[in-house]
Amino acid sequence: MFEQMKADNIISTRGLKADAVHFNEMVFDVNSAYFDNHGGYEYARQFYEEAYKSAVEIVGGEQYILSAVMHADEINRAMSEALGKDVFHYHLHVVYVPVVEKQILWSKRCKDEALRGTVKETIMQVSRSKKWLSKPAVDKDGKPILQVNGKPVLRKSYSVLQDDFFQHMRAAGYTDVERGERDSTEEHLTAVSYTHLRAHETTLHL
């Protein structure tokens, strides 16, 4: 499929090193409680169909996605034991080709002087150099948080992507989804904490 994308001029490997990475992967992961509270598999399938649309926006287009698979065969053992039933952990894996837009200019050797230095063609070059947007961090009043040198504190780019995904899902009608705590290292919910959650509470990670 990668070679076909090259043949169809969807991507370009021009100037790419032999050992360069050709693929990236994103994992969309929501805790097991959220889907179990909504009935399980069918709800998770619909949720991740919408999440896939968010992935398309993030990578720049569906043409760069190689595969998107929802894993539905993993059991959250802690929750299953606590509730006395199988509670599955659903998540979505998206494998894609990372690209950056690159303009190729006419060289000084071009016979037509008027063309020299102008854009000859635009390619989508396979590259992991794309930098996701970082945004200034703000306090509860919406004011920028500053460092001691007066420069704004920037939120990590993956946190911005998490925000974008969260907002996408909310706009799509999943209004009971709650964004995970920023800068939290917690990934899984324990059986004890699960039993104290309200039905709509969830932790969402990109």
Where are these regions (language model features)?
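Secondary-structure junction/capping motif
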Residues: S127, E186-T190, T202
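Short, highly charged C-terminal tails/helix-capping segments
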Residues: G180-Y194
